[in-house]
């Protein structure tokens, strides 16, 4: 894929080879979101317009997943907006890692695979021969308590929940 910025900062995306009837996996994190979300959308659209057989978005970090509901007046549901845009450009599948809010998978009728990095993380931790005797997995908020408890159980360590409050 060739990415090019015009003098005004506008992005141009082009596939440099024929992808007609090919399965195309586009791997793109959405961090930082301002530029990477547009890059992702343009690459997905370019693949579809180049007659790819299937277009699969692999998004290791799915930005805007925290904005999964209308938690106060006059705010968007940004996760939904991003998935609507991905749907409009025409994708066949989405793969994302460790979603902040797994329920966003229901915002789109496209197959959505939610993958967990914990398997690779646990295997890597074993290589360090760490002593987990006094270890604790900390959950930063109530929303992460369930997954944090499962990590603690798998590692055989304690679990703690932090009371996080944001200033208004």
Model-derived regions: residue spans:
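PRPP-associated nucleotide enzymes
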Residues: 1-168
């Amino acid at each position: 894929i060739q990415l090019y910025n015009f003098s005004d900062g506008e992005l141009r995306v082009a596939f440099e080879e024929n992808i007609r009837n090919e399965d195309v996996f586009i791997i793109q994190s959405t961090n930082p979101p301002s530029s990477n979300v547009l890059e992702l959308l343009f690459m997905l659209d370019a693949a579809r317009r180049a007659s790819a057989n299937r277009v699969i978005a692999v998004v290791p970090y799915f930005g805007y997943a925290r904005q999964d509901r209308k938690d106060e007046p006059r705010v968007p549901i940004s996760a939904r907006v991003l998935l609507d845009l991905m749907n409009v450009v025409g994708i066949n599948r989405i793969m994302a890692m460790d979603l902040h809010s797994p329920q966003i998978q229901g915002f789109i009728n496209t197959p959505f695979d939610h993958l967990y990095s914990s398997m690779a993380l646990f295997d890597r931790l074993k290589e360090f021969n760490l002593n987990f005797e006094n270890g604790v997995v900390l959950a930063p908020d109530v929303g992460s308590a369930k997954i944090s408890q499962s990590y603690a159980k798998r590692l055989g360590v304690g679990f703690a929940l932090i009371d996080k409050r944001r200033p208004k």
